[in-house]
Amino acid sequence: AMVCAAKGYPLVITMAESFSIERRRLMRFLGAKVVLTPKEERGIGMYNTAKKLAADNGWFFAGQFENAANADIHESTTAREILADFQDSPLDYWVTGYGTGGTVTGVARALRRERPNCKIIVSEPHNATLLGSGLPQERNADDSPNGSHPAWEPHVIQGWTPDFIPKVLQEGIDSAFFDEVRPVDGMKGMAMAQHLAANEG
């Protein structure tokens, strides 16, 4: 939304009606049009609505859940920042969650190549263990998700673990990038984030 605002590009964002008012307001503040989807349709409903709107109107669809450029940019930027921060010291663990899968896959590529001893730990909600379940994601011919993953249940942190395994994340699974998948209680995760912000900056 910030890039579109800076470049003057019109932007339409789909959001489930269960998303926070603050998130909607921020997107609108940045000039985006927000289209709400029924909360019962989960993330897959937002995805399908965005895809249909783009197709019906001739708009560009970013397809961030399938677009390889998502992981590529994190491999060439985010990973470089992390490695630069640990240039003169060991990097024992990298712990992350996932949304589209771009950050975790892109950074994991670089860590596997340049810091092979670093343990990569992926967290997901304790009540939405998509990776931990070992169950595959059903996909359409274009690699888009064919419905919600059977292990997903609603959880408290928006943007963390959608109700399907993104194609971008599938690369990390297939390449065995992850040393461990750790389920985390969302409420405990938020409490720890507040603790870290207050005590570590």
Which role fits each region the language model picked out?
Residues 57-102, 106-110, 171-175, 179, ...:
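Active-site/ligand-binding-proximal alpha/beta "capping" segment
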Residues 9, 32, 59, 116-118:
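Short glycine/serine/threonine/alanine-rich loop segments
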Residues 1-53, 130-145, 166-172:
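Active-site-proximal loop->helix
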Residues 27, 82, 120:
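Conserved hydrophobic/aromatic pocket- or pore-lining residues that grip, position, or stack substrates
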Residues 14, 37, 64, 121-123:
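Generic beta-sheet signal
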Residues 1-7, 104-114, 118, 123:
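Short Gly/Thr/Asp-enriched flexible loops that form oxyanion-binding sites at enzyme active sites
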Residues 47-48, 57, 113-200:
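Active-site/ligand-binding loops adjacent to catalytic centers
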